[in-house]
Every structure is written in C-alpha cells, then in structure tokens.
Amino acid sequence: MGTNLSVPNPLGFLPDHQLDPAFGANSTNPDWDFNPIKDHWPAANQVGVGAFGPGLTPPHGGILGWSPQAQGILTTVSTIPPPASTNRQSGRQPTPISPPLRDSHPQAMQWNSTALHQALQDPRVRGLYLPAGGSSSGTVNPAPNIASHISSISARTGDPVTIMENITSGFLGPLLVLQAGFFLLTRILTIPQSLDSWWTSLNFLGGSPVCLGQNSQSPTSNHSPTSCPPICPGYRWMCLRRFIIFLFILLLCLIFLLVLLDYQGMLPVCPLIPGSTTTSTGPCKTCTTPAQGNSKFPSCCCTKPTDGNCTCIPIPSSWAFAKYLWEWASVRFSWLSLLVPFVQWFVGLSPTVWLSAIWMMWYWGPSLYSIVSPFIPLLPIFFCLWVYI
C-alpha cells in the first residue's frame, strides 16, 4: 500500500482508501496517494491503540474511520444552548388548543368555547403557554378564532360505539325465530306425505302399497304410490291427493281461527236464524245481555224473539259457532236438511256411539300416533294464536 499505486482498492474495502474516482476522489478528497493525513506504510509495524484495544487496529485509521472516538480517544463535547428562537421562555408562543373541525371520536369530550377557556385556566396548562413573568391577571387570551362558524360546532363523523350485548340480542332473537320457523316448516311439510301414505294404505289393507302405474305403458321401477316420478301415470293422482290434503289442512286452520275469533268476542255469537222475522228491536243477530252475570266474552245464543227481545240461553261459543256454520250451510245447500233426522237419530244412540268410538280406538290405536304425530308442529302455532289474538 503506501505510495504504491499498483495496490488496487476498487470497492473501498479499506476505510478512506479512495482510489476510485467513483468513490469520491477529487481535489478536496484526494485518493490515498495524495491524502495528506494518511499514515505511511512503514508505520504499520507500530502498535496502534484503537477502539478494539492495542494491536487490533492499524495506525492508519482502522475499520471505524478517522475520528478520535474510532481511535479510542474520548473527548467531552460541551452542550450548546438552543437559540432564542426555539426557547420556550422567549420568542413565538405556541398556538392554544382550538376545537377540532371534525370530531371523529364522539366518545371523547366535546370541545366548545367554555370548556376550552376552563381548560386554559389550569395552572399546568398556563405554565406551558405563558412565558415567565407573563400576565398577572390570571386569564389567558386564546388566539382569535379566525375560522368559520362551522369550526365551533362539533360535527360528528360517526355514531357512538354500540354495546355488543345489544348487537347480540338484536341478532339472536330473529335467528332463533328463523330457526324455529324453519323447523316447523319442515315438520309441516311432512303432514301431506303422512296423510297421503295413510290414504293410499286404505287401498292396500294387509299388504304393502305398490303403485299401480308401474305395469302400464310407461313401466317404472317398483315404488310407493306416495313417491311417484313424473313419468309415472300415478303421478297426477298423487298430486291430486296432496292438493286435497292441503285444502283439508287449510280448512282446519280456518275453522280454528274462526273459533278463536268467536271465543275472543270478535264475531257475532248469535247469527241470523233462517226464517226469523224482524221485530221492533231489529233482527235477532246479537245477544244483548249475557245469560249469566257480566261475562267478558258472550257465551249465549239468541233463539226466537220473545216480546220483541232476544231470549239468550247459556250455550258455549264454540257450539254457537258450530250452529252458525250449520245454519249457513243449510241455507246454501238444501240437501243438508235431509241429514238432520239421521244426525238426531245417531246422537240419540249414545251408548252405541260410545261403543263404536271405543272399538275404533282399540282397532286404530297402534297406528293412531303415526297419523296424529304430523299435526304436532301445528299445536305451538295454534297455541300462539290462541294467546296473542
């Protein structure tokens, strides 16, 4: 090294050995051969004191550079005080706190002129904003408000954080209702299939139900008549049976709803009897006075008018509603009147009726649950309607 120009250092692996102009060799920062502060190569045999101890750092700078600290020499540097322009006790004072133009944290304190003035009265705040020996009046005059009037208004950019409990309860209720409704729907949809199976089983007493359309012109594989494919001739009969079953279910629901409305007193209990005459008090349609005491719901039915007034007898509203339906149907279907003697005769045979009912319960008992079980999901719906309507 030394003055030997043949020793290359193209990438500057040795500190400050700048032989390549690309590493800053110029008139103010010459290369190694023209560096006035370089150590000559014969001095490299001497033991130097560097940052890593004796003999570990060459005397011509070492890997840490040319600074005294790199050579192991520690010097104390005096602290220079900051200029007056940056001193807190003199020069320009910082601008007092101003209300934010947009309040993106509504849960924080809302700033206004009164709250700002009270905050500036705090001695800790005054010590930061007033110079030494400042005003002795004890008040702080904030910077004049040159902003628009909108800056004094707290403009919220978002609503306060909603409590997670309210969010959970708000979503949990509809989800539970949706789940219960879906469960009831799936159970209700099994009612037509169960009734269809019972209906078709009446045609195959003592044997397994088999679709009769499989031996026709469009043969299909053996299947139940309750699950006919569309190509089976029995598919149309299956759809017809299920349509009748759906109408039957809707009729039951309608009857239950009308009975419920009648029980709540929302329907006239005493219908217009066919053939009744109009009296001075008008047609006998409603019961003016309950039969027994002041009942909340009407529980009587009008018979023939006596002396211009309705004579009420204590009959349950459900029986009154059944009588109303029978009278309504008798007016529109005259042939139903032919069934009255038969019904009266059948009711008169009460022991026979009870024996027949007992025999049917004993005969149909084992399969009665399978017939009634599909209607069980309807019970909660009927109960809710009964309670809340």
UniProtKB/Swiss-Prot annotation:
Isoform M is N-terminally acetylated by host at a ratio of 90%, and N-glycosylated by host at the pre-S2 region. Myristoylated. The keyword Membrane applies. Glycans are attached at residue 309. Residues 2-108 are annotated as: Pre-S1. Residues 2-242, 192-242, 359-364 are intravirion. The chain crosses the membrane at residues 171-191, 243-263, 338-358, 365-387. Residues 2-170, 264-337, 388-389 are virion surface. The keyword Acetylation applies. Residues 77-95 have a biased composition (Polar residues). A lipid is attached at residue 2 (N-myristoyl glycine). GO terms for biological process: caveolin-mediated endocytosis of virus by host cell; fusion of virus membrane with host endosome membrane; virion attachment to host cell. It is found in: Virion membrane. Keywords: Acetylation, Caveolin-mediated endocytosis of virus by host, Fusion of virus membrane with host endosomal membrane, Fusion of virus membrane with host membrane, Glycoprotein, Host-virus interaction, Lipoprotein, Membrane, Myristate, Transmembrane, Transmembrane helix, Viral attachment to host cell, Viral envelope protein, Viral penetration into host cytoplasm, Virion, Virus endocytosis by host, Virus entry into host cell. Belongs to the orthohepadnavirus major surface antigen family. The gene is S. The large envelope protein is synthesized with the pre-S region at the cytosolic side of the endoplasmic reticulum and, hence will be within the virion after budding. Therefore the pre-S region is not N-glycosylated. Later a post-translational translocation of N-terminal pre-S and TM1 domains occur in about 50% of proteins at the virion surface. These molecules change their topology by an unknown mechanism, resulting in exposure of pre-S region at virion surface. This is Large envelope protein. The large envelope protein exists in two topological conformations, one which is termed 'external' or Le-HBsAg and the other 'internal' or Li-HBsAg. In its external conformation the protein attaches the virus to cell receptors and thereby initiating infection. This interaction determines the species specificity and liver tropism. This attachment induces virion internalization predominantly through caveolin-mediated endocytosis. The large envelope protein also assures fusion between virion membrane and endosomal membrane. Residues 2-163 are annotated as: Pre-S. It comes from Hepatitis B virus genotype A2 subtype adw (isolate Japan/Nishioka/1983). Residues 77-103 are annotated as: Disordered. Residues 109-163 are annotated as: Pre-S2. One of its GO terms (cellular component) is membrane. Systematic vaccination of individuals at risk of exposure to the virus has been the main method of controlling the morbidity and mortality associated with hepatitis B. The first hepatitis B vaccine was manufactured by the purification and inactivation of HBsAg obtained from the plasma of chronic hepatitis B virus carriers. The vaccine is now produced by recombinant DNA techniques and expression of the S isoform in yeast cells. The pre-S region do not seem to induce strong enough antigenic response.
